[in-house]
Amino acid sequence: MGGAAGVGFGGLVGHRGGGRDRRAGGGRRAPEGSVVTGVSTVRVAPDETDETADATFTSTRPLDYLPGILLLIGVGVLGKYAQIWWNALAKHEHWTVPDIEYVLWAIVIGLVITNTVGLHPIFRPGVLTYEFWLKAGIVALGSRFVLGDIAKLGGISLVQILVDMTIAGTIIIAVARWFGLSGKLGSLLAIGTSICGVSAIVAAKGAIRARNSDVSYAIAAILALGAVSLFVLPPLGHAIGLTDHEFGLWAGLSVDNTAETTATGYLYSEHAGKIAVLVKSTRNALIGFVVLGFALFWAGRGQADEIAPGVRAKAAFIWAKFPKFVLGFLVVSAIATAGWLTKGQTANLANVSKWAFLLTFAGVGLNTDIRQIARTGWRPLVVAVIGLTVVATVSLGIVLLTSRVFGWGVTT
């Protein structure tokens, strides 16, 4: 992403490597060893081990988060009321228009704020917590799943993911080479597009000793694709005639970042959103294995740190990269499956999940800076677009083949 673009009053602009932010007020420096994506500062230090891709908690003072969290709530609630207002207006005027879900309203409102007046720095710490709310929502969503269903669908989606990942990853690396991108940038784009978006890119950065510039380009490209997926895949799903279950599988297999995957699924329907979250969580669980594979490849070429020999060392590497919120999702599901939750408690957890996702969707919009993404070099973006097209096409073919030909995981 090289340099970054700021917006509005005091919008954040930064360089890689601790460059000085070009703001109206001037003088603020981005943290050393970080890049700026949208309105978020992402640590890409070589010793990065956290499974999250962005600095979710950027301040040690709790009150710093209050303005941004209130903004997330405000945008989310406004999106909900916008849906109600739109439906009432359409009914009153006798318009034949689709029901626009609150998910899209919240994202669009956030996009408009960030890309017009801009996001004031006072809101930034709280807005960046949207990834936390996403993970909290996924954990709470575990109460809606029975472990048997998770095992069945997870096993099916694992096969789909492995086939999709192998085909798409190979094509993306080949296309990146054809466009003259560095081998490691091609690896980052393949990892981000086929597994888990920004989280996977940051997890791989230190493991393969990728340059900060390569990480910046890959992150910007993935963020751009996430925004595109939100607006392209749901209409395509309706045009193709996908069931809620099929679309949830497709979104979970093809959309990169977990937040955008969740939003894309829920834009189609609540059931599609639940399936998308489950499939995406299965993809997330593979981060450690994929990063380990690329690390061993580059280490064999003398261009990455050696991974200590032995099964124990490799298991420790995989655990360090494993997204822990997936375990929380499974634990809550196990508790619900065992019958230890009353109907009231299950309903409360469902409400917690919905509210957490509402804040997440608002954060997706507020964290998408279109002008900054546009400043990314065209080649990584083109490769990423080709990658998204390949992943979406291959995954759609896999979903249709497994559901309509083989009848795997078909639900009524």
From Swiss-Prot:
What GO cellular component is one of the record's annotations? plasma membrane
Region of interest called Disordered, as start-end residue ranges on this chain: 14-34
The UniProt entry lists the main location of this chain as: membrane
Q: What is the disulfide pattern of this chain?
A: none
- What family is this protein classified in? Belongs to the UPF0324 family.
Name of the protein described by the UniProt record: UPF0324 membrane protein MAP_2119
Query: How does the entry describe its membrane topology?
Result: Multi-pass membrane protein
User: What InterPro entries would the database entry show?
Assistant: UPF0324_pro (IPR018383)
- Location within or outside the cell: Cell membrane
Can you tell which superkingdom this protein's organism belongs to? Bacteria
Does the record's keyword annotation contain Transmembrane?
Answer: yes
Write down the species: Mycolicibacterium paratuberculosis (strain ATCC BAA-968 / K-10)
Keyword Transmembrane helix included in the entry's annotation: yes
Q: Where are the transmembrane segments?
A: 67-89, 102-124, 128-147, 154-176, 186-208, 215-237, 275-297, 317-339, 349-368, 381-403
Keyword vocabulary terms for this entry? Cell membrane, Membrane, Transmembrane, Transmembrane helix
